[in-house]
Amino acid sequence: MSKLTHVREDGSAHMVDVTGKNETSRTAVAEGFVKMRGDVVKQLFSAGLPKGDALPVARIAGIMGAKKTPDIIPLCHPLPLGKITVDFFELADGVRIEASVKTRGVTGVEMEALTAVSTAALTVYDMIKAVDKMAVIDGIRVLSKTGGKSGDWSVQ
């Protein structure tokens, strides 16, 4: 098993030293789902929810979440994010949220992509909970990443 890079010999946590790493172009794509009743899906995608048009709000929340990742996830490095996209795909039983993040830096952007998806999903949940109390956030994961010493990776 490989050693955790953010844990010192005595077991205490520290922020990994990335000052000696080369800058490379890095990307990450993550996804997540909000499951809900079919009638609520229709309201969500037609801007018909009591709280208003949820998808533009959730998109901005996801982008803001990615930018705030080092403020809410301990030990994450602040990164100059060059591009963040958050997209929504209608499903019969909910919405699939996909976030893509890009930077040129010394560490990856997987956490930023995951935070974008999570924040967007939480925002969708907040805006539908009045009409579907049984909604579920599920399946948040990294789909792919590029760049860095460990190279490219994808679930496919």
Swiss-Prot record:
It catalyses: (8S)-3',8-cyclo-7,8-dihydroguanosine 5'-triphosphate = cyclic pyranopterin phosphate + diphosphate. It comes from Corynebacterium glutamicum (strain R). Belongs to the MoaC family. The active site is at D126. Homohexamer; trimer of dimers. This is Cyclic pyranopterin monophosphate synthase. It comes from the Bacteria. Pathway: Cofactor biosynthesis; molybdopterin biosynthesis. Keywords: Lyase, Molybdenum cofactor biosynthesis. Substrate binds at L75, C76, H77, M111, E112. GO terms for biological process: Mo-molybdopterin cofactor biosynthetic process. Its EC number is 4.6.1.17. GO terms for molecular function: cyclic pyranopterin monophosphate synthase activity.
